[in-house]
Amino acid sequence: MDKKQALKTAAYDVFSKKGYKATGISEIARQAGMAVGSFYNYYESKEAIFLDIYIDENNRVRQAMIEELDWEIDMIDLISQLFAQSRALVSYNKILAEWYNPAIADELHSYYSSEEGKVANPFHQFLVKTFTNRMQAEGYSPEKIREILQVYNLFYYMDMHITENDFPDINKTVEILATNFIKGILK
């Protein structure tokens, strides 16, 4: 295993157990079997390695969601299952739960709201493609599909910019909005 991968493996282990705030670079380096100075040959900061770990973990968990959910079921049921699955997988994951931690949230939100982050986010790309294909198959006009995807982009924007500190119960509120939006479209 190369040194960068050893750092990532050690960081994943430590962040998974302790969370972001309680983890130090010295502990990651020690667990990887290298000096702290060597850490900086591969990552410029704790934030940088955490972002790398977070992206990998988010992709892994979201891929599991893609594989586990039935994307052909009734849209209202699908939205409900999508939110429930996301809550279940994120709430018990110390790495993904850091999305709401003010100490690192800005870094994570900044990455995922950037064009690079959107393009490199396979779950986001999957949702856009899957919902677009489904709407096309159901006979929605290109204009209606664009309008609906614009609302999806608003939900994505809210996820990137509104935290629980800004708006208590934001996740539940977004779920209610999404569910009722879909109900309105299907009428």
Roles of regions detected by a PLM:
Residues 60, 85-93, 155-158, 162, ...:
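Phosphate/oxyanion-binding loops and surfaces in catalytic or ligand/nucleic-acid-binding neighborhoods
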Residues 52, 56, 66-92, 149:
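Hydrophobic alpha-helical connector segments
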Residues 88-112, 160-164:
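Amphipathic alpha-helical segments used for helix-helix packing
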Residues 98, 135-180:
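Hydrophobic/aromatic-rich alpha-helical bundle segments in the mid-to-C-terminal region
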Residues 62, 108-139, 143-147:
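Amphipathic alpha-helical packing segments from all-alpha helical-bundle domains
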Residues 180-187:
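C-terminal alpha-helix
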Residues 46, 53, 57, 61, ...:
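Hydrophobic/aromatic residues within well-ordered alpha-helical segments
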Residues 6, 10, 14-48, 52:
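Helix-turn-helix
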